[in-house]
Structures are given as C-alpha cells and as structure tokens.
Design a protein with these regions (language model features):
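Mobile amphipathic helical/loop "lid" adjacent to a hydrophobic cofactor/ligand pocket
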Residues: 48-52, 56-57, 61-165, 169
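A short coil-to-beta-strand element that immediately follows conserved catalytic motifs
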Residues: 65-66, 213, 278-281, 354-365
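Glycine-rich active-site loop/strand segments that organize a redox cofactor
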Residues: 28-46, 114-118
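Helical element adjacent to the flavin cofactor pocket in flavoenzyme catalytic cores
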Residues: 170-233, 246
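Conserved flavin/dinucleotide-binding core of flavoenzymes
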Residues: 307-423
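A short, Lys/Arg-enriched amphipathic alpha-helix followed by its capping loop at the start of a domain
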Residues: 3-12, 207
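Mid-domain catalytic core of redox enzymes
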Residues: 215-338, 347-352, 379-382
Length: 423
C-alpha cells in the first residue's frame, strides 16, 4: 500500500490485488470476543519518518493515533532506563549512566560502547553477529541480558547469536543517534487496519485507482512491453488476465518466490527469496477484569516466556486487556496455546501480584512473522532483470530489519522508480 499511495500521489493509476479478504498483511486488525485486536504489537519509533509521513498523507493524525512515549526500557524489578529531556545523543548517554539495576561500572561500559559506535559511524568492516559485536566491546552477560539483548530481539526479531550486527547498528544509529524524538516509541491507539490500510485504500480510490481484496494473483506473465497478471477465480468473479505496464510484487516472500519461479528471467531471484529463513512472533492476549492495569503502558520481564507486556487499557482504552509478546524462536513454540497462555498468566501473577484470572485469552502465533535478520544475509534488490517488474518488502535489500519502516521504504522506492520511467 505504500507503493500504491506513492504512485497515486504522482497521478499514476494503480490497481492493488490483495489475496486476503482484509488488507494489512502481518500488520492488521482481528476480532475476538467482540474485541478489536492486532495480529501483533507493532511499535513505531520516532525515526520511522517515511511511515509516519505516509500515515499523515492518507489522513492520519500521529498525536491522536499513537501514544508517544520517550525512550524507556523497563524490565520489571530488574532494570530501568529512562532518557531525560536532553538533545541526542546526550539523552541516551545520561539515561544509561542513570539507569537502575546495573553497577556504575557496567553503566559506564554501556555508555562507552555507544560512543565507540559513534566514532566508527555505526559501520563495521564486515558483518558479524550481535553477540560477537557486544563481546568485542566488553559488554558482559548481564548487560547483554538486560539491555542489548532485549533491544536486539525487539528490533531484529532474531536471536543475538545469529543476528546481523550491521543491521543492529543501523537501528541504533537512526533511533538513538539522531534527534531526541527519533528514539520516541509510538504505540498505536487503533488497530493497524484502521491506522493505515483502510485510509490508504480510500486515498488510492480517490486518485482513480482500485483496490481488490480476496483477489489472488496466480501468475506473472511477460507480454510484449507489458506484464500480464492472471488472477484466481473467486465466488464473485471468474479467472481474469489483465495487462499492466509495470508490476510491483509486494507479497510475502513465499508468494513472491512462487510467482517468480515460473518466469525464467526471475527464477534466480525466486531461489534467493526461498533461501531466506523466518522468525515467529507470538502475542498472548489476556482479558482481565477492567480494574486490572500494569504499572506502565509497556513493561518487560526478565527470563520469562513473556518478554514485553502492553496494557491496552492505557494505550487504547481497552481496559483490562494485556498483550504479552514473545519474539523470535524459542521453547514457547513447543507449547499448546492454552498452556502458553496459562504460563504467561502465572508469570504476570508472580511478577506483578495480579491475582485475578483472565476472563478469556487468545494466542496469535505468526510463525513466519519476519525474515530472520542474520549475518551476511543476501537480500534481493527491488530491481529485477525485467525492468517493469519490481520487488517490494521489508526483506529486500536495505538498512533495516523486518520493520514497517523497512517495508514502507521499499514500497516507496519501487513506486518512485516507476514514476520516473513514466515521466
């Protein structure tokens, strides 16, 4: 949808094909027990300038649509970092030096690490794992467990022993070393479908475009100077072939590989995409009685199944609703959903003293939520051997891991490439 909006703004007529009945992909709203949920907790950072600009472009209001929190990282009863109101990067350095839960020597070590990264311009001569990088700069087990590990898992959704240090440094550079507001955390007050895809759909339609849901593209067929798309028949339409001047494939990696594999010029890219591994994200929703609330809107746990808790009452007015997030691979994947919800409930009881039982629970397991952002990962370019077929997605070549900002940048890049050729 980022590509579609960008093209629509350039007065290019676009048609969006969405195989699902609902727009949004992995950032979408879902209904459960008459309560509106997200399929995952998607945090935006202040440095996500392209995403925030795009939301405003289609009619969003950032201050109304998000709860904005200054940089903070709290692991309950174990570690707390809150950045003071200072210009960057002094807000982070002061926050590290004043953080609670670490000795002063370790706090100083963390601050020196950030200064060292700034001196090398957040650039490594060659990629290594995040764990290797942290060890290289004398960050010990406690610093890794309480500070850098949670940041890495949250940002890259990849365990630190295999996560790309260079991509990790890109995230630190843009979020912690720019403007102070770049490190702000923005928690959506409304579900993601309402936040962007629905508004983007109206924007595209107002600019003489079309958005077709429940309409799956089954084949990409080069035809002369154009590209034919073959769509699957549905309950309300027959199979259909339509010719376009350009095509942006913004589907999941699995679907993109399937579509590209049948086109000889794109077969190599299909194999490259198919070689990308994925990581899961589990969200455990627990609906407690309305009076139940967390000490703060976002709270972390140390050495628990639940890594982060979000109080949807404080964030979105959904009182008593707690979302527990478990990022990346782990033993939780071996548990049945009911048992996982039971264990998270027990952790909340033990850690926070919340004795009330949840009225209901819902576990949403996105088993292929993101690409695994590993060291030296060969990510495909947005350009392909067919000049009028482009590839968009957060897994394509770029500075960022699997984030909304990475996806938006990729889509906008494809759109601008096409807009230039049509001038």
């Amino acid at each position: 949808m980022a590509a579609a909006v960008t093209l629509a703004a350039a007065n290019v007529s676009v048609t969006v094909f969405e195989s699902a009945k609902q727009l949004g992909g992995r950032a979408r709203g879902v209904q459960n027990n008459d309560v509106q949920l997200d399929n995952g907790q998607h945090i935006l950072l202040g440095c996500y300038h392209h995403t925030l600009q795009l939301i405003e472009q289609v009619g969003g209001n950032i201050e109304h649509d998000f709860l904005r929190l200054p940089l903070q990282l709290t692991l309950h009863n174990r570690f707390e970092l809150k950045a003071p109101h200072l210009p960057a990067p002094f807000h982070l350095l002061a926050g590290l030096l004043r953080s609670k839960g670490l000795s002063f020597g370790k706090r100083l070590r963390a601050a020196r690490f950030m200064l060292a990264l700034s001196r090398i311009n957040f650039t490594l001569p060659h990629d290594i794992s995040v764990f290797e990088l942290l060890r290289m700069y004398d960050q010990d087990d406690e610093l890794i467990r309480l500070l850098w590990g949670p940041i890495c898992i949250s940002a890259l959704n990849t365990p630190i022993h295999i996560a790309s240090a260079q991509v990790f440094l890109h995230v630190l550079r843009d979020s912690l070393n720019g403007l102070r507001s770049d490190s702000d955390m923005l928690l959506p007050r409304i579900d993601f479908t309402a936040l962007f895809p629905e508004r983007a759909t109206e924007y595209v339609k107002q600019h003489k475009g079309a958005v077709l849901t429940a309409c799956s593209v089954e084949a990409i067929i080069p035809h002369g100077e154009g590209i034919k798309l073959f769509t699957r028949p549905t309950a309300v339409s027959t199979a259909h072939t339509e010719l376009f001047s350009h095509v942006i494939c913004a589907s999941s990696p699995i679907s993109a590989a399937r579509l590209f594999r049948t086109v000889p010029q794109l077969a190599f890219i299909a194999e490259q995409i198919a070689g990308i591994s994925h990581q899961p994200i589990y969200t455990v929703y627990l609906q407690y009685p309305e009076q139940v609330r967390l000490p703060q809107p976002m709270l972390g746990f140390d050495r628990c199944f639940a890594q982060w808790l979000f109080d949807k009452g404080q964030i979105a007015g959904q009182r008593g609703l707690i979302a527990a997030v478990i990022s990346a691979q782990g033993s939780h994947q071996n548990l049945k959903h009911d048992l996982l919800a039971q264990k998270v409930t027990q952790e909340i009881c033990e850690q926070l003293g919340i004795m009330e039982a949840p009225l209901w629970h819902k576990v949403i397991a996105e088993k292929r939520a993101t690409f695994s952002c590993e060291t030296n990962l060969p990510r495909p370019s947005h350009a392909t051997p067919l000049a009028n077929v482009l590839l968009a997605g957060d897994y394509t070549a770029g500075d960022y891991p699997a984030t909304l900002e990475g996806a938006v940048i990729s889509g906008m890049l494809c759109a601008k490439t096409i807009a230039v050729t049509l001038q």
